[in-house]
Amino acid sequence: MAKRTLFGTDGVRGTANREPMTADTALRIGMAAGHLLRNGDHRHTVVIGKDTRLSGYMLEPALAAGFISVGMDVVLLGPLPTPAVAMLTRSLRADLGVMITASHNPFQDNGIKLFGPDGYKLSDDQEATIEALLDNGLEGHRAGPTALGKARRLDDCNGRYVEFVKSTFPRGRRLEGLRIVVDCAHGAAYRVAPKVLWELGATIVPIGVTPDGTNINKDCGSLHSRVMCETVVREGADLGVALDGDADRVVLCDEKGALVDGDQLLALIGRNWKRAGTLQGGGVVATVMSNLGLERFLKDEGLALARTPVGDRYVVEHMRAEGYNLGGEQSGHIVMSDFGTTGDGLMAALQVLSALVAEDRPASEVLDVFTPLPQLLRNVRVAGHDPRAILADPQVARAVSAGEGRLNGGGRLLIRKSGTEPLIRVMAEGEDEALVAQVVGDICAVIETASQ
């Protein structure tokens, strides 16, 4: 497999109007991806969705121009969640799906995620092939004047996704009597998420639903959940739901304002699906970041926890290869392959709401599935330095080895570079919270010194 340099763990990402997030590079990515995925004799189609970032107005037409120039028709969806783009790629029998988003990042960033005709994210090999096409020139792949593609907008895409998500909620159940705070992060779900919950009968308190192009994820959404938690308590709500900018991840909070992460959601859904006889694969797929408490809980339930590298695409790849139908990340990506091909925050929230309705107990009881071990994650910014070189630094290596020795088999230590930002992430967990904090602090200090 050729080495990827443009694509990270979740597509291409960077600062808007700076390489690689320029109109020129977006056009060339469209040409290369269109050439790669343009298979068969039928009329070729690509669907393009986006979140609410200002730079989407620049990248959307650039990508469309690239696809049109290699003979592909373009269907423009406008602001719509990432899982909706994956769903519509399959529904419209498109050759390719594109989501313009930088997910949970601030508005200054943007990115490009690519989906194949089956609705799954492209493989590492396919992304490497696209990079090779970019490097080797695209002149020979342009369509002739009469073979250019066309572009049109799909007017009812929001309604299609709303009905699709609602179809995953058990028939006969309604959300009447539940008061739900939904934080859409001023992002891609600002129209569809409140609509789904309202149509299922809930009383909704929407926040983060007034995007202006620059406020996506700003002090709101799944990474900044304080406002949601405070609003739940103030409004006397039964549950809070916070999505990120492209709505492929979710975190919740109970009626007391306590935050509930993806590990608890995996535990709840996995246990319930096991009892219902619908869980496949004998367990759940998660990443190396998931809490050891989740692993112990699943073991007590007679279920396995399969771990993958960080990134929902790797979770999905393992699920497909080994026959699992539930996986996700602590950050709130929850993948349920019975319903979809990628993480879907809104769909995951409905699984939890279904449990609330069925059990008729407060969220604080239903969502307290297991007790997590003390876990601490810190990010060290290393802009301008190669994270791999820093991690290979002898002083850093000694600090990591010393940390592992101090945990002495009673916990886990994980140090890795981010696939989407110039960060090194340091995570430790164990029974002794004070020791965990010391280990993380010492390693971060050495990394900061090495990156100066």
Curated annotation (Swiss-Prot):
Q: Where is the active site?
A: S103 (phosphoserine intermediate)
Q: Which organism is it from?
A: Rhodospirillum rubrum (strain ATCC 11170 / ATH 1.1.1 / DSM 467 / LMG 4362 / NCIMB 8255 / S1)
Q: Name one GO cellular component term.
A: cytosol
- Phosphoserine carried by residues: S103
**Which superkingdom?**
Bacteria
Q: Which residues bind Mg(2+)?
A: S103, D244, D246, D248
One family name in Pfam for this protein: PGM_PMM_I
GO terms assigned for molecular function: magnesium ion binding; phosphoglucosamine mutase activity; phosphomannomutase activity
Asked if the keyword Isomerase belongs to this entry, the reply reads yes
- State the post-translational modifications: Activated by phosphorylation.
Physiological role: Catalyzes the conversion of glucosamine-6-phosphate to glucosamine-1-phosphate.
**Which major enzyme category is it?**
isomerase
Q: Record's HAMAP family? A: GlmM_B (MF_01554_B)
Please give a single GO biological process term from the UniProt record.
Answer: carbohydrate metabolic process
Kindly indicate whether the keyword Thylakoid belongs to this entry. Answer: no
UniProt record similarity statement: Belongs to the phosphohexose mutase family.
Q: Which keywords does the record carry? A: Isomerase, Magnesium, Metal-binding, Phosphoprotein
Q: What is its EC number?
A: 5.4.2.10
Cofactor, how bound (note):
Binds 1 Mg(2+) ion per subunit.
Residue ranges spanning the membrane: these are none
Please give the catalytic activity noted in the UniProt record. Answer: alpha-D-glucosamine 1-phosphate = D-glucosamine 6-phosphate
Which PROSITE patterns would you find in this protein's record? PGM_PMM
What does this protein need as cofactor? Answer: Mg(2+)
| Protein known as | Phosphoglucosamine mutase
